Amino acid sequence: MEIKDGFIAINKEKGFTSHDCVKQIRKLLGIKKVGHTGTLDPDVTGTLPIAIGSATRFIQYLPQGKTYIGQIQLGIRTKTDDMQGEILNKKDWPVLSHKQLDKYLNNFRGIIQQVPPIVSSVHVNGERAYKKAFKNEEFELKPKEVEIEELVLNKWDQINGILEIKVSCSSGTYIRSIARDLGGSLDSEGCLLKLKRISACGFHEKNSIKISDLSDNNDKNAPFIIPTISALDHISTLVLANQEEINFWQTGRIIKFDANNFVKSRSFDYKKPIKIIDPNKILLGIGFINEEKTILHPKLVLNAK
């Protein structure tokens, strides 16, 4: 069986880079066009959605939220803000009840300004920050706005200074920064001890598979491939009702918008992208409606003519 496109949720194991996973998927499935939805550090485990074939064009339209389970070690500051980096300072942590520690976490809930770790993929004057850090160059990273939708204190070990948190956040959030800044707010230090991503871009750990469990036989791999249209289930849907409209679409021409063709099972927001399908529920691409709500503009066209 030939696999042409779709998504596969990989349960990334420790030690692998995201690019390592992409290379292995290319080799196993025999497909050149493969990409991931966002980098996971080598020591971070968990959900890594990977796009195959034409699905790579739809990555930007996936849900952007991500959820992590992480352990933070108080009392230690490192160069990388996790336990892999050089230790820069050690400082005792205060005696805190679970409730008291949870109150400190309020500083990291909602929309916040966050400074990324210096060892990160953020660009600084055209170069990745981690490259500058490894060359011991001095530079400053600007804070950026991120949203912490949920931050739950699961466990608190006062004796060892280790807390476990569950974090649901926007794309671009660094859990290492939360660890570092929490330690600072406690007049101590902090770094990330362990991290696992349990969901990302609408894909969940429970539906993921380890690369080592995949086969070089695509008949066996096929059940793990998620159709692109299923990955876009959160997006409103518009049906092109006839062949003339489909021909217009596939040649990149605008189409008169007919609200009666809207699939009513999804709420409709004219400012957001819409997935376009034919009467047989075949995905045709992504479009937008103009402000007057009269014209459908093609944005991403599959099988363009």
From Swiss-Prot:
SUPFAM superfamilies: Pseudouridine synthase. The active site is at 41 (nucleophile). The keyword Transferase does not apply. Its EC number is 5.4.99.25. GO terms for biological process: mRNA pseudouridine synthesis; tRNA pseudouridine synthesis. It comes from the Bacteria. Signal peptide: none annotated. One of its GO terms (molecular function) is tRNA pseudouridine(55) synthase activity. Keywords: Isomerase, tRNA processing. It catalyses: uridine(55) in tRNA = pseudouridine(55) in tRNA. The keyword Isomerase applies. PANTHER family: PSEUDOURIDYLATE SYNTHASE TRUB1 (PTHR13767:SF2), TRNA-PSEUDOURIDINE SYNTHASE (PTHR13767). Responsible for synthesis of pseudouridine from uracil-55 in the psi GC loop of transfer RNAs. Belongs to the pseudouridine synthase TruB family. Type 1 subfamily. HAMAP family: TruB_bact (MF_01080). NCBIfam families: TruB. This is tRNA pseudouridine synthase B. The gene is truB.
